[in-house]
């Protein structure tokens, strides 16, 4: 919706699940460990409705009902593919949102603020500073008004101060239609203190007359680790959208963490629902900056009738030696379970031990000559995130008086890791 002299105009709401349960796109490789054979990637796993009738013959699986390909015994082909989309079937869901231009807001005594009311898009990861276009004022503002059609708007900003040099510059804006059925809110902020902590963030939410609602939060942080004394940058994003006309919606949580010595952690939790079907996905990457890498993915889906299916894999490598393993599984409404497990051991000498079995009796165990390949470094690391965080780095803290030093609490524990519980649908901030 856009607020202007003629009022708020609500745009249609889209809950397209084209990105439902997608794998992360393969990234350009910078440096990798090669040993002496052919490249291997993560295994392909898909499931179809036909697979429910004969799961023991399933090697590739889809949700779109395509005919599954039978698996060759004793041999495994490895590749990385995306879990297929689960589109919302309603006509509204087929309409695509156009990217809105980001235009100036928060001009004191200017026209009514305009909203980036477009719901967040699925599987777009963490936006950049430039995409958010945060522009805070140097003066306090508190304004409100009513448009010709009876819709209202408000805009305010401030500068809060606290102990230890804490400073928070912020801006809030929003509006709603005359009957309150359409509403939007947006908040920006930047924080800093004498410890070197800096934070840049934004949050927006909205709803329309059809009952659809959405919410998005973005944040990036710079701080110095108390124990390692290394600078760290962390970025995160949370997004959700709900349909007001059907039992449909989705939620995503993304995070990235970097330090100045190459330690990197990335991950995401995703959840979606379309009437009688729900799906989840979790994945993570960890690089210790000294050559060790861990990657994993776990995704699954289920229907209200009791059918469940999923796929997961994991790989660990260091200095050319490591392993890969995974499982594909399916449970029928009657409780019958089928699964196939597989694994690879890479010895770093050109030999790879491959093994696996399924609940239908197939099995394999052999050693082959193959090259070991894996990404030893993240495709996007410390140097990249520093280059893309110019606004965060330019935040100016309150000047510290001579002889006054920041208070650092070494007893404070580090932030808890993300929960392993499946992400659900948190309530909308507008409810």
From Swiss-Prot:
Family named by the database record: Belongs to the ESV1 family.
Pro residues bias: start-end ranges: 415-431
Gene behind the chain: ESV1
One CC-aspect GO term: starch grain
Keyword Chloroplast attached: yes
Gene Ontology biological-process annotations: negative gravitropism; positive gravitropism; regulation of alpha-glucan metabolic process; regulation of starch metabolic process; seed development; starch granule initiation; starch metabolic process
Boundaries of the annotated transit peptide in chain numbering: 1-19
Keywords from the named record: Chloroplast, Plastid, Transit peptide
InterPro entries in the cross-refs: Alpha-glucan_binding_chloro
Protein name in UniProt: Protein EARLY STARVATION 1, chloroplastic
Sequence segments annotated as region (Disordered): 65-126, 403-431
MF terms in GO: starch binding
């Amino acid at each position: 919706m856009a607020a202007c002299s003629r009022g708020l105009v609500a745009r249609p709401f889209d809950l397209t699940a084209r990105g439902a349960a997608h794998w992360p796109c393969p990234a350009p490789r910078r440096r990798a460990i090669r040993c002496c054979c052919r490249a291997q990637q993560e295994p392909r796993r898909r499931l179809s409705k036909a697979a429910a009738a004969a799961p023991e013959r399933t090697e590739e699986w889809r949700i779109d009902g395509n005919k599954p390909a039978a698996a060759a015994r004793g041999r495994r082909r490895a590749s990385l593919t995306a879990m297929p989309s689960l589109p919302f079937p309603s006509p509204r869901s087929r309409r695509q949102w156009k990217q809105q231009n980001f235009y100036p807001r928060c001009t004191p005594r200017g026209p009514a603020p305009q909203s980036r009311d477009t719901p967040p898009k699925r599987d777009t990861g963490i936006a950049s500073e430039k995409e958010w276009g945060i522009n805070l004022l140097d003066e306090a503002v508190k304004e409100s008004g009513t448009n010709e059609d009876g819709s209202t708007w408000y805009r305010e900003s401030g500068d809060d101060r606290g102990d230890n040099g804490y400073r928070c510059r912020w801006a809030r804006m929003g509006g709603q239609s005359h009957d309150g059925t359409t509403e939007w809110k947006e908040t920006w902020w930047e924080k800093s203190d004498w410890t070197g902590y800096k934070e840049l963030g934004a949050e927006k939410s909205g709803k329309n007359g059809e009952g659809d609602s959405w919410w998005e939060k973005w944040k990036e942080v710079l701080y110095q680790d108390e124990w390692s004394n290394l600078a760290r940058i962390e970025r995160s994003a949370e997004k959700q959208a709900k349909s007001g006309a059907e039992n449909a919606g989705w939620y995503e949580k993304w995070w990235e963490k970097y330090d100045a010595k190459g330690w990197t952690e990335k991950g995401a939790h995703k959840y979606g629902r379309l009437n009688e079907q729900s799906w989840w996905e979790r994945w993570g990457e960890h690089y210790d900056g000294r050559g060790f890498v861990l990657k994993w993915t776990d995704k699954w889906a289920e229907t209200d009738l009791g059918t469940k299916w999923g796929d997961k894999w994991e790989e660990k490598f260091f200095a050319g030696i490591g392993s890969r393993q995974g499982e594909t599984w399916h449970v029928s409404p009657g409780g019958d379970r089928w699964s196939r497990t597989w694994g690879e051991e890479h010895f770093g000498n050109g030999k790879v031990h491959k093994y696996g079995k399924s609940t239908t009796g197939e099995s394999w165990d052999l050693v082959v000559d193959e090259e070991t390949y894996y990404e030893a470094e993240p495709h996007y690391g410390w140097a990249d995130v520093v280059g893309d965080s110019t606004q965060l780095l330019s935040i100016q803290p309150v000047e510290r008086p001579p002889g006054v030093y920041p208070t650092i609490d070494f007893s404070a524990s580090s932030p808890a890791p993300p929960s392993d519980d499946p992400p659900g649908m948190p309530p909308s901030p507008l409810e």
